Amino acid sequence: MNEAVTIRGKERYKSGVMEYKKMGYWEPDYEPKDTDVIALFRVTPQDGVDPIEAAAAVAGESSTATWTVVWTDRLTAAEKYRAKCYRVDPVPNSLGQYFAYIAYDLDLFEPGSISNLTASIIGNVFGFKPLKALRLEDMRLPIAYVKTFQGPATGIVVERERMDKFGRPLLGATVKPKLGLSGRNYGRVVYEALKGGLDFTKDDENINSQPFMHWRERFQYCMEAVNKAQAQTGEIKGTYLNVTAATMEDMYERAEYAKELGSIIVMIDLVIGYTAIQSMAKWARKNDMILHLHRAGHSTYTRQRNHGVSFRVIAKWMRLAGVDHIHAGTVVGKLEGDPATTKGYYDICREDFNPMTLENGLFFDQHWASLNKLMPVASGGIHAGQMHQLLHLLGEDVVLQFGGGTIGHPMGIAAGATANRVALEAMILARNEGRDYLHEGPEILAKAAQTCTPLKAALDTWKNVTFNYESTDTPDYAPTPSVSV
């Protein structure tokens, strides 16, 4: 039902239910402004639902609309504040799925707030009944919006200066087993790994303050290990002390204590939420600390191709939010990571400008307005025998974390660390000499292993270990005509 209200002979208002595409949320002739936030959604309408109407509904429900016309729209600049879907394309090789391009006026969002942005973009709209599924694939964040954020607290350049390590990836390891060790034994793992040649060790995502090891005990033993390893090797070392806790007050307390003990880096988990992440990033900037983010929980909404949020969007949000490290995939490891898609993630973290690169899943040009660069972290099922592949695929501005590949070494933790360091140094030398290190990699490693027993043992132990599974999230970039034409 749709009833018109007439005032002085002019139709001013219609009550009732209207199609979203007739309410101003579908504007195929709209030219996005430089200051617009643009979101690309993968829309899967219910059977029988017009894709244009479904896309317009996403625009409406993620901005100003509700299920019926409301007269209070007339009290606002409704034409300005309505999100505008201006393009709908069928997704290549995915029947019944459509890419919807939606522009949002910048004034819809609070400056410098990821929580406010996400409340609209991934809010109630994801539960909308006319849709079978909905996925946020990418976003174009205008410079005017990017400039309202702090960005990474430290950044790659300053982190390298602080560590005094240049021209190669940094090496790390996650302490294993992740749960159950006493504080003393935990600290011993940290010491052995750092002494053997790693730059960092790391708490895992779910080690906080449990009955078997209080957080304060862990921090003390870990920093004792860091200081001892630094004195022994003459190198700056670090360990990611996980300050994730139940409240912000607890997190600040733990972070302050880590600083008092001399730590250069603290860690948080993605599951603490966007407001907490930004709060810790501001603390890290103020206190000259590197902030590591473990992306715990992301696969619950990033892994499936038809519903959720792409990790490329999470990476963009986290660069804005201000973390210094983020796990971004390995390609060759045990966790999800298509090579082309993963390159897109790494480019988001490390480049000043991301051009539209459809083969890497980047649908828009993205300028980062001089925000610091974010160091990607590769971890999960990697070992020394893959060093040539890791260097080729991920470059040098990355932290390579060999957890099992260090602590599972048959000769012990220090030997595992040494194997990884020698493998990396051999590959960097080959690269600097101009050799084709990708194809000569096995030969380079075998030669280095002749004078490094730990590396030989690592190569023998894991030589046949691969994780060759088909990725569930790959780019869709075949050029197609728009259904809006």
Curated annotation (Swiss-Prot):
Catalytic reactions of this protein: 2 (2R)-3-phosphoglycerate + 2 H(+) = D-ribulose 1,5-bisphosphate + CO2 + H2O; D-ribulose 1,5-bisphosphate + O2 = 2-phosphoglycolate + (2R)-3-phosphoglycerate + 2 H(+)
Role of this protein: RuBisCO catalyzes two reactions: the carboxylation of D-ribulose 1,5-bisphosphate, the primary event in carbon dioxide fixation, as well as the oxidative fragmentation of the pentose substrate. Both reactions occur simultaneously and in competition at the same active site.
Oligomer status and interactors: Heterohexadecamer of 8 large chains and 8 small chains.
Site (Transition state stabilizer): 334
Binding annotation for substrate: 124, 174, 178, 295, 327, 379
GO MF, one example: ribulose-bisphosphate carboxylase activity
Residues the entry annotates as binding Mg(2+): 202, 204-205
Cofactor note: Binds 1 Mg(2+) ion per subunit.
Annotated positions of the N6-carboxylysine modification: 202
Gene name per UniProt: cbbL
Sorted UniProt keywords: Calvin cycle, Carbon dioxide fixation, Lyase, Magnesium, Metal-binding, Monooxygenase, Oxidoreductase, Photosynthesis
UniProt-recorded name of the protein: Ribulose bisphosphate carboxylase large chain
PANTHER family with a match to the protein in the record: RIBULOSE BISPHOSPHATE CARBOXYLASE, RIBULOSE BISPHOSPHATE CARBOXYLASE LARGE CHAIN
Necessary cofactors: Mg(2+)
Anything else known: The basic functional RuBisCO is composed of a large chain homodimer in a 'head-to-tail' conformation. In form I RuBisCO this homodimer is arranged in a barrel-like tetramer with the small subunits forming a tetrameric 'cap' on each end of the 'barrel'.
Enzyme class: lyase
Positions of the catalytic residues: 176, 294
Protein origin, superkingdom: Bacteria
Record has Lyase as a keyword: yes
SUPFAM superfamilies per the UniProt record, alphabetical: RuBisCo, C-terminal domain, RuBisCO, large subunit, small (N-terminal) domain
Pfam family, one: RuBisCO_large_N
Protein species of origin: Rhodopseudomonas palustris (strain ATCC BAA-98 / CGA009)
